[in-house]
């Protein structure tokens, strides 16, 4: 029986339960990580980090033509359906200005990560071109290896090292560059202790032992920063003012709804002309991203016309 997942974007390829037989045919290594649930249904052992990685590898190969994908131990292994939702809702946002989704959009992924997940999905689904920024040498090396291992990706995805860990756009967006949008999955904890506590909650929910590796992993720069998510996004908002004529839409995920009011205040103080919130849901998980622009309707249309 094929049950639809509530809340996913209509164009999301993961509307229904995973077809494990098809995924195992695409990626045979997934077969060794299948288990039976108490109800007798076949499933993936989500408490096993290697199983989650094998599932991601299969999903990317089966749906997005990514034939070679791997990440080093300890890095975030992102749930593909949720990441795809961000891309599809971003496409809708970009399409609102002209009435159609742009086929040649240029996107900046702030903190592309070892998994390179957003560019992989965006290139396949919409033919977009991506620049990915990264502060971690190890993450950048992993993302670069994925790009080089898959035919055609090097023409669509380029990576830039963020040499200043205190900067977000500065040093990445060059003087004469223009982007249709930026996207970001920001660090959400405000300390290493909070990140560990969050990992422990996930571990308990998955029924893992204390010594087990957490299935979604995460390096320091992926999980926490001083002041947490609100401080990081406020910094992004402040810095975005310097690039107000080079970027059409700045966007970022916001993990908690209660974080929105201080961010809205920061956007008003920064002079954002329009602010949009896109709600998303994957099963029981609620998420959202906010988008802001410093251009009015006419300026946005002119920006797109000039850029094309």
From Swiss-Prot:
GO terms for biological process: rRNA base methylation. Its main location: cytoplasm. It catalyses: adenosine(1618) in 23S rRNA + S-adenosyl-L-methionine = N(6)-methyladenosine(1618) in 23S rRNA + S-adenosyl-L-homocysteine + H(+). GO terms for molecular function: 23S rRNA (adenine(1618)-N(6))-methyltransferase activity. Its EC number is 2.1.1.181. The keyword rRNA processing applies. One of its GO terms (cellular component) is cytoplasm. Keywords: Cytoplasm, Methyltransferase, rRNA processing, S-adenosyl-L-methionine, Transferase. It holds the Pfam family Methyltransf_10. It is found in: Cytoplasm. Transmembrane segments: none annotated. HAMAP family: 23SrRNA_methyltr_F. Specifically methylates the adenine in position 1618 of 23S rRNA. Belongs to the methyltransferase superfamily. METTL16/RlmF family. This is Ribosomal RNA large subunit methyltransferase F.
């Amino acid at each position: 029986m094929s049950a639809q997942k509530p809340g996913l974007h209509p164009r999301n390829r993961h509307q229904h339960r995973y077809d494990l037989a098809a995924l195992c045919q695409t990626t045979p290594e997934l077969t060794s990580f299948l288990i039976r649930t108490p109800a007798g249904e076949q499933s993936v052992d989500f408490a096993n980090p290697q199983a989650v990685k094998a599932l991601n590898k299969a999903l990317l190969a089966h749906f997005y033509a990514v034939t070679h994908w791997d990440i080093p131990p300890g890095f975030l292994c992102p749930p593909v359906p949720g990441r795809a939702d961000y891309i599809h809702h971003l496409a809708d946002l970009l399409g609102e200005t002209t009435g159609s989704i742009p086929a040649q959009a240029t996107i900046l992924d702030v903190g592309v990560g070892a998994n390179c997940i957003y560019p992989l999905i965006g290139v396949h689904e919409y033919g977009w071109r991506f620049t990915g920024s990264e502060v971690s040498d190890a993450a950048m090396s992993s993302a670069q290896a994925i790009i080089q291992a898959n035919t055609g990706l090097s023409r669509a995805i380029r990576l830039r090292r963020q040499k200043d860990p205190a900067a977000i756009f500065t040093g990445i967006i060059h003087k004469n560059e223009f982007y249709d949008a930026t996207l970001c999955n920001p660090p959400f904890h405000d300390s290493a202790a909070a990140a560990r506590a969050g990992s422990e909650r996930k571990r308990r929910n998955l029924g893992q032992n204390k010594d087990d590796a957490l299935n979604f992993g995460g390096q320091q720069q992926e999980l926490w920063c001083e002041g947490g998510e609100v401080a990081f996004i406020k910094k992004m908002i402040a810095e975005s003012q310097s690039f107000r004529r080079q970027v059409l839409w700045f966007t970022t995920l916001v993990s908690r709804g209660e974080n929105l009011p201080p961010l809205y205040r920061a956007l008003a103080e920064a002079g954002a002309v329009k602010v949009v919130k896109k709600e998303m849901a994957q099963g029981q998980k609620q998420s959202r991203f906010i988008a802001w622009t410093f251009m009015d309707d006419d300026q946005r249309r002119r920006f797109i016309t000039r850029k094309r």
